[in-house]
């Protein structure tokens, strides 16, 4: 028989005796029923109590002296026990003491037994039973307040020779009160008490002292504790799950924290029906205990509307104040949430494993969060995932010290030892599914440690939680832009349909659109609250910086001690299998998060060292053997771009590192050039257009570092070290400039024509359909023109920089003709007879400035004008070169003071040399007479100087021509089969024949001249 049952039977027997006595005696007077004991003034140890007492308000609690006792008389032990029992239990054996409850029946029992009329350790149990028979529905409250009095009295007990005795008796009384409190809660019918909802008592105004709860749990640890507290934990978690940041009762979270701080209660959690009942991602925050308490959110329509509705009309101060207030609430909540998880993890090994299993279940069930389109009912919410990420980032902090002293505790073999994080279906860095499965099918010895679990779980939550939320924000912002454009179009249509039925319909549609726009804009601020909390962004940066160092260390080899010692670059050509088989998101999580910080100019970036991030970008930018996906490595270039740019209110965050880092100053320039070449072909259908965006970032980084002393002379060094590599780079840059400027000028001409067409249509009142079609075409042309102009400007500026540094490199036979043709063509477009077609309304809208572009093109001419090969190349361009165009261009330059008189004279001298060479060539060509067709290059139609035979087509072509072709296209130009320069063979016979022909013509010319 359990203790509870014994006490229950004892109580029933006592009640029977009491009832029989009551039948033969009169009812006690109402005046004898004392009021409930006054609640002691406790400090802050009540779970759920909303009241706090300042130090100035605290008063020492001392037991009041009964009216019959002398004020200064010392108590004997028996008297003291009687006194303290009366005070604590609010009972008395004196009929005249109206301040306490008179135990008349109990007094008679003592008299019949001949016992002293004093409460003591032998009879206090019975006395308490007698008192409890009268408390009714207030039984639990009575027991709790009595215990609280004893707790406070014991804390202030003065030291004397009877201290141990007093402590023993006080503990006995407290133990009795706790035991009977358990009976009241578990067996309320024993005292005719109402059923106690312990959860409601905990969150009530008075709450329950933590020490009482601790003793309660200790007393009943082995007696149905789960039946009592499992419903409490479930109830409290459900309450949190129904709250948002505007309605949250933080005391409920505090209660849960206090409960789980008691080990027996914490160990009950895995027994909860809601502990881990589902692996459905959409149900986690509703059906699981940890999901419910982690679901507090600002992402509700109520919160968004209350704080941020009509945001365009609110003051910036008002919005900022709301954001700060909600951030504070979320910060307070997340702090308690972390304490709960931290407590659980430290409670026991088994509970820690259960919590880690839960985290793993959540992240493995949420892979769809990174999908382009997803049903939000199939995934866990942004708020819940961000709260989980917050907890894991806090758990990661102990191993994120500045010196990375614990980095070797992150186990490379983690995914070969029954990992919690599922990466089976993830795209790997440089391994296909078969290779990956083969690698991971070979288990590693040992077991995974806690640091590794937290490391890989946190990384996965940053990918599927934090970064997926940033992506959701980007989609929301894009949706707002689309809605704003739609609104503009509908408003235009409404004006054109004024007074018609369609206008009324459009009015209703616009009203709905305004409501949606207002809500969407409000939610943007909600995202700002969750994603820009400085403490969170700082933790995430530190963690992902640590991940970048860990990856660099892994690539550097087993003997690497990075970051204590520098990286050994370039990395080994053969990447470790452990690296190649890691998921792509290990890199992507770093790049995407860092880009989010750079794009928003987060203040977090100023709080940390950026050197590891810079070195990470430089080290892996060209490492295709380590990171196969070029688009993933392109994000490294994008980080460098945003890092060296000037941001609003903040200087170039990465520039200092780029200037001083030994890794950057040695490897950045060649890495940018190599990646510029590599991105020419990505294997994707969109590669032709993708490369321009990526190269824009590269050009901007070039442009920035060009001015830095640490990079002076680096370009010349690269050209001397590997000339073929450099020529390939220059050729691709030239291709880009040719295409982009050509497309930009074509689109500007199209815009010019469409703007003229629209002006005529409006003045002639043409049909709305024609106007709308023209407006649509104009909008498309404007978008394209803006892109082409911006990209073209950067590329031509790069040509200006590079030609100023190493002009001879641009006069290589493979590229000089194309460079001259490109410059001449654009000069003609800007200054020729059709230049008026480039006049558009607000050209700055498209990043187009004709004078600036003309000046840059002239700079390239000036940089190369003293190179004979360039003079010849310009003279050979019979399609675009014109002396008159140069004269018109110099006139424009002079008129607008775009160039100095010295530069103008240099250009005129250059044109004179070109004209002289053209005259000389014309004379020589006339002397040549008829030239056999097979002496002519099949592509350039000039006499071949060094003919070679293409292996598969068998066609002879000049070596310089095929070299130029192969710089941008590694195929035979006549049958598109793969081709390299090593495949061609010299056509010595044809070369000798051509040389003989030329010699004979020269001899004939000499004789005629004589």
Curated annotation (Swiss-Prot):
PROSITE patterns: U_BOX (PS51698). Residues 930-1004 form the U-box domain. The keyword Membrane does not apply. Residues 24-44 have a biased composition (Basic and acidic residues). GO terms for biological process: ERAD pathway; protein polyubiquitination; ubiquitin-dependent protein catabolic process. Pathway: Protein modification; protein ubiquitination. Pfam families: U-box, Ufd2P_core. Disulfide bonds: none annotated. This is Ubiquitin conjugation factor E4. Keywords: Cytoplasm, Nucleus, Transferase, Ubl conjugation pathway. Residues 13-70 are annotated as: Disordered. CDD domains: RING-Ubox_UBE4A. InterPro entries: Ub_conjug_fac_E4_core, UBE4, Ubox_domain, Znf_RING/FYVE/PHD. The U-box domain is required for the ubiquitin protein ligase activity. It is found in: Cytoplasm; Nucleus. One of its GO terms (molecular function) is ubiquitin-ubiquitin ligase activity. E4 ubiquitin chain-elongation enzyme specifically involved in polyubiquitin chain assembly. Binds to cdc48 and elongates mono- and diubiquitinated ERAD substrates presented by the ufd1-npl4-cdc48 (UNC) AAA ATPase complex to a chain length of 4 to 6 ubiquitin moieties. Delivers these polyubiquitinated substrates to downstream ERAD components, which target them to the proteasome. Enhances ubiquitination at 'Lys-48', but not at 'Lys-29' of the Ub moiety. GO terms for cellular component: cytoplasm; nucleus; ubiquitin ligase complex. Belongs to the ubiquitin conjugation factor E4 family.
């Amino acid at each position: 028989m359990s203790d509870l049952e014994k006490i229950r039977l004892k109580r029933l027997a006592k009640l029977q005796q009491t009832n029989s006595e009551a039948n033969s005696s009169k009812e006690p007077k109402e005046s004898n029923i004392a009021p409930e004991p006054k609640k002691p003034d406790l400090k802050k140890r009540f779970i759920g109590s909303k009241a706090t007492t300042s130090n100035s308000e605290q008063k020492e609690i001392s037991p009041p002296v009964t009216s019959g006792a002398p004020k200064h008389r010392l108590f004997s032990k028996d008297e003291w026990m009687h006194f303290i029992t009366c005070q604590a239990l609010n009972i008395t054996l004196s009929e005249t003491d109206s301040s306490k409850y008179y135990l008349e029946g109990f007094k008679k029992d003592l008299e019949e037994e001949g016992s002293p009329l004093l409460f003591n350790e032998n009879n206090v149990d019975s006395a308490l039973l007698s008192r409890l028979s009268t408390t009714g529905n207030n039984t639990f409250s009575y027991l709790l307040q009595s215990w609280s009095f004893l707790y406070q009295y014991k804390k202030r007990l003065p030291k004397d020779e009877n201290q141990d005795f007093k402590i023993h008796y006080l503990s006995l009384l407290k133990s009795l009160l706790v035991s009977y409190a358990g009976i009241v809660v578990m067996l309320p019918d024993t005292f005719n008490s109402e059923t106690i909802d312990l959860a409601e008592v905990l969150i009530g105004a008075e709450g329950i002292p933590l020490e009482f709860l601790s003793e309660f749990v200790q007393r009943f640890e082995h007696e149905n504790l789960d039946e009592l507290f499992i419903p409490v934990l479930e109830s409290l978690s459900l309450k949190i799950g129904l709250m948002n940041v505007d309605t949250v009762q933080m005391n409920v979270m505090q209660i849960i924290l206090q409960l789980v701080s008691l080990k027996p209660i914490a160990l009950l959690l895995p027994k909860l029906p809601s502990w881990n009942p589902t692996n459905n991602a959409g149900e986690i925050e509703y059906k699981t205990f940890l999901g419910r308490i982690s679901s507090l959110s600002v992402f509700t329509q109520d919160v968004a509307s209350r704080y941020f509705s009509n945001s365009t009309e609110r003051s910036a101060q008002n919005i900022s104040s709301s954001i700060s207030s909600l951030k504070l609430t979320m910060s307070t909540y997340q702090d308690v949430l972390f304490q709960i998880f931290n407590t659980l993890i430290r409670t026991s090994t088994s509970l820690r494993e259960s919590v880690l299993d839960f985290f793993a279940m959540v992240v493995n069930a949420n892979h769809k969060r990174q999908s382009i389109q997803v049903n939000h009912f199939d995934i866990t919410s942004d708020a819940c995932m961000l709260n989980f990420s917050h907890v894991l980032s806090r758990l990661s902090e102990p191993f994120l010290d500045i010196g990375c002293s614990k980095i070797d505790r992150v186990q490379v073999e983690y995914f070969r030892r029954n990992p919690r994080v599922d990466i089976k279906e993830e795209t790997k860095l440089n391994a296909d599914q078969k290779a990956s499965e083969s690698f991971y099918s070979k288990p590693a010895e040992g077991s995974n440690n806690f640091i590794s679990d937290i490391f890989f779980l946190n990384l996965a939550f940053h990918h599927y939680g934090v970064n997926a939320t940033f992506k959701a924000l980007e989609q929301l912002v894009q949706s707002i832009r689309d809605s704003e454009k739609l609104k503009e179009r509908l408003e235009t249509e409404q004006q054109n349909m004024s007074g018609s039925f369609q206008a009324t319909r459009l009015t209703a549609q616009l009203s709905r659109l305004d409501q949606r726009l207002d809500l969407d804009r409000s939610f943007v601020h909600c995202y700002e609250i969750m994603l820009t909390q400085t403490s969170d962004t700082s933790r995430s940066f530190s963690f992902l910086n640590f991940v970048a160092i860990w990856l660099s260390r892994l690539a550097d080899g087993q003997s690497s001690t990075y970051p204590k010692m520098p990286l050994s670059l370039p990395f080994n050509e053969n990447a470790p299998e452990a690296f190649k088989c890691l998921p792509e998101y290990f890199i992507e999580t770093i790049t995407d998060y860092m880009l989010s910080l750079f794009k928003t100019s987060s203040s977090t970036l100023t709080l940390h060292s950026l050197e590891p991030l810079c070195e990470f970008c430089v080290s892996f930018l060209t490492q295709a053997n380590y990171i196969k996906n070029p688009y993933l490595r392109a994000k490294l270039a994008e980080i460098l771009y945003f890092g060296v740019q000037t941001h609003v209110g903040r200087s170039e965050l990465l520039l200092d590192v780029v200037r001083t880092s030994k890794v950057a100053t040695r490897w950045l320039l060649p890495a940018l050039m190599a990646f510029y070449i590599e991105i020419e072909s990505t294997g994707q259908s969109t590669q032709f257009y993708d490369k321009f965006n990526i190269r824009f970032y590269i050009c901007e980084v070039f442009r920035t570092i060009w001015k830095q002393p640490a990079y002076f002379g680096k370009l010349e060094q690269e050209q001397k070290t590997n000339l073929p590599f450099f020529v390939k780079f220059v050729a691709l840059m030239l291709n880009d400039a040719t295409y982009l400027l050509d497309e930009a000028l074509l689109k500007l001409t199209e815009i010019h024509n469409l703007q003229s067409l629209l002006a005529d249509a409006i003045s002639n009142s043409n049909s709305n359909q024609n106007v709308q079609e023209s407006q649509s075409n104009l909008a498309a042309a404007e978008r394209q023109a803006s892109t082409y102009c911006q990209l073209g400007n950067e590329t031509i500026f790069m040509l200006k920089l590079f030609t100023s540094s190493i002009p001879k490199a641009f006069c290589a036979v493979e590229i000089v003709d194309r460079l001259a043709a490109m410059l001449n063509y654009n000069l003609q477009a800007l200054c020729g007879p059709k230049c008026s077609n480039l006049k558009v309304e607000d050209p700055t809208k498209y990043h187009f400035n004709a004078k600036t572009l003309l000046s840059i093109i002239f700079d390239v001419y000036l940089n190369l004008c003293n190179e004979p090969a360039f003079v010849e190349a310009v003279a050979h361009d019979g399609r675009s070169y014109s002396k008159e165009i140069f004269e018109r261009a110099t006139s424009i330059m002079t008129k607008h003071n775009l160039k100095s008189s010295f530069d103008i004279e240099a250009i005129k001298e250059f044109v004179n040399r070109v004209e002289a060479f053209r005259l000389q060539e014309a004379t020589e060509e006339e002397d040549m007479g008829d030239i056999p067709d097979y002496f002519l290059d099949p592509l350039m139609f000039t006499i071949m100087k060094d003919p070679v035979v293409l292996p598969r087509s068998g066609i002879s072509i000049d070596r310089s021509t095929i070299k130029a072709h192969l710089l941008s296209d590694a195929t035979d130009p006549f049958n598109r089969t793969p081709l390299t320069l090593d495949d061609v063979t010299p056509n010595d016979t044809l070369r000798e024949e051509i040389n003989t022909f030329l010699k004979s013509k020269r001899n004939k010319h000499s004789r005629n001249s004589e």
